[in-house]
Each structure stands twice: as C-alpha cells, then as structure tokens.
C-alpha cells in the first residue's frame, strides 16, 4: 500500500470513527464484560437485568478511561512504534490536554455512576481505578515490570470485576472462594490472547 493510499484511507470518516473506537479500547470492553457477567449471574441467578446492563456501562467507561490513560502515558513510545502510526495522539488528531480532560470525565463518571449500587461496589471500582494508575503511570508503571503486569490484570479481571458484580446482589463475604482461581486463569488467558491479536 503506497503512502498516498494510506493518507486517503486515514482521511475517510469511517477510518476516523474506527480509530476513536480503538482509542477508547472498545475491543477490550468484552474482556471486562465477561468476568462481570459471570460474577453477576452467580450472585443474582439471572441472565439479564437493568442492573447488569448498568454495570456493563460502568465497566465500559472504566475500560475506556484506562485505555486513554495508557495512550497518554505511552505517547513518547508510541511515536517511535510504526504499529501506532494511526493513534489519535500520535497523529495529533487529539491533544494531550484534551486526552486528559476526556480521561477525567470518564473516570469521574464511572465513580459517580457507581453510587447507584452500594459501598462494596464503589470500593471495587476505586480499587480498579488505583490499579489503572499504578499499571500505567510512573513511578510504578507495573505494565513494564514482568510479573506485576500479570498480577495487575489478574487482580482486575479475576478478582475486583467479578467481586463488583457479585456485590450488586450479595455481600462480598459470601463470594465463593474457589471461583477466583478458575476465573483468574481463564481471564488471563483471554486477555493475553487479545493483546497479541
């Protein structure tokens, strides 16, 4: 594909919309939805409800805020990575300042929406927020530390997200303990397969 052809593709409206979806981590929403759905169904013993879809909305917003933070923290590395040439930040479609504003809008919206449920749910969401920060930002930046990156994803996907879903209908103290191991193993495998696509 020639450089001229690439430029024509980049300028199309469909491409712009798709890059926005990538920027907010749309394709990773399902990674968060899966453990949330499992935790909710085990707790509430129903396959769908308003609470479930409301929870999905919160997880989607949280995932998007995390991905935007990732783009912000990785901007200098992404500029040197040919695979990131279509990134909105790398191309200058969105500024760093606007990215921070969007991140905080999504992050605060996620926390505010969480008040509809209970304090246990809110604590789980706040825990996920903390992991998002230490995973992406200096001086912690767990994503660049072998072992800590997997631990962060395991705690998020295998522990806090299903706990949040469970807490909508049941107290956290009653969460089935053996559930953790199988969920963590399954979701880490799912996550690792997706990031290598």
Regions found by a protein language model. Give the residues of each.
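Multi-pass membrane catalytic core of lipid/isoprenoid biosynthesis enzymes
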Residues: 75-126
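Alpha-helical transmembrane segments of integral membrane proteins
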Residues: 23, 53-54, 97-104, 119, ...
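Interhelical loop and helix-boundary elements at the membrane-water interface
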Residues: 6-31, 84-100, 134-159
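Conserved small/polar residues in nucleotide/adenosyl-binding loops
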Residues: 195-197
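Transmembrane helix-loop junctions in multipass membrane proteins, especially transporters and channels
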Residues: 44-47, 75-76, 115-119, 137-144, ...
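Juxtamembrane/interfacial segments around transmembrane helices
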Residues: 85-86, 107-115, 150-161, 176-186
């Amino acid at each position: 594909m020639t450089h001229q052809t690439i430029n024509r593709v980049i300028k199309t409206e469909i491409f712009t919309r798709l890059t926005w979806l990538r920027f907010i981590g749309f394709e990773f929403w399902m990674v968060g939805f899966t453990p949330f759905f499992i935790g909710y169904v085990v707790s509430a013993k129903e396959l769908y409800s308003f609470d479930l879809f409301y929870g999905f909305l919160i997880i989607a917003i949280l995932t998007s805020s995390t991905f935007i933070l990732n783009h912000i923290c990785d901007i200098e590395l992404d500029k040197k990575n040919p695979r990131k040439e279509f990134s909105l930040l790398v191309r200058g479609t969105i500024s760093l300042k606007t990215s921070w504003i969007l991140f905080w809008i999504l992050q605060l919206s996620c926390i505010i929406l969480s008040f509809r449920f209970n304090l246990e749910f809110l604590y789980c969401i706040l825990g996920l927020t903390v992991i998002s920060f230490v995973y992406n930002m200096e001086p912690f930046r767990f994503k660049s530390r072998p072992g800590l990156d997997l631990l962060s994803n395991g705690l998020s996907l295998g522990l806090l997200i299903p706990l949040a879903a469970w807490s909508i209908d049941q107290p956290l103290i009653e969460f089935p303990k053996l559930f953790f191991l199988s969920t963590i193993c399954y979701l880490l495998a799912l996550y690792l397969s997706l990031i290598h696509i």
